[in-house]
Regions:
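Family-specific signature for flavin-dependent thymidylate synthase
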Residues: 1-133
Length: 133
């Protein structure tokens, strides 16, 4: 517990003091609308996409040429896409701070999930001025 408390105090001083969070990684499967994934692409450091569903092979299976192009051009942004993603705790902290009160409900749901991770209260949400964090 002594190490966790030390890490927690360093996290409060900012990213430059919390380098240890870069080494704590979480792997998860997320099923979200494509418009949400476009916003998630903002976070490129401390995250890695391990796999994702291909619209061409999943929903557009069997289409070729102009039919395939027309399908992809008209593909709704609300369609769900599943991806397996890796995040560092440092990136999850950044996401949490920036998106916990976002107007898209998917971000609030994602931030609620972040709070369920081991030691999230000491390493991710600590010092974020959340009453219930």
């Amino acid at each position: 517990m002594k190490d966790i408390n030390l890490m927690s105090s360093l996290v409060k001083f900012g990213d430059e003091h919390a380098k240890v969070l870069r080494g704590i990684n979480v792997y998860t499967e997320i099923n979200a609308p494509r418009y949400w994934w476009q916003e998630m692409d903002t976070y490129r450091v401390g995250t890695e996409r391990l796999s994702s569903e291909s619209t061409m092979h999943m929903q557009g299976n069997g289409l070729i040429g102009d039919e395939l192009i027309a399908f992809k051009e008209n593909f709704a942004e609300g369609n769900m896409q599943k991806r397996i993603q890796m995040f560092s705790y440092q990136t999850l902290r950044r996401i949490y701070i920036q998106r916990k009160n976002h107007r898209l409900p998917q971000w609030r749901t994602f931030c609620e999930w972040i709070k369920t991770l081991p030691y999230a209260d000491k390493l991710i949400t600590v010092g974020t001025n959340d009453v219930d964090a």
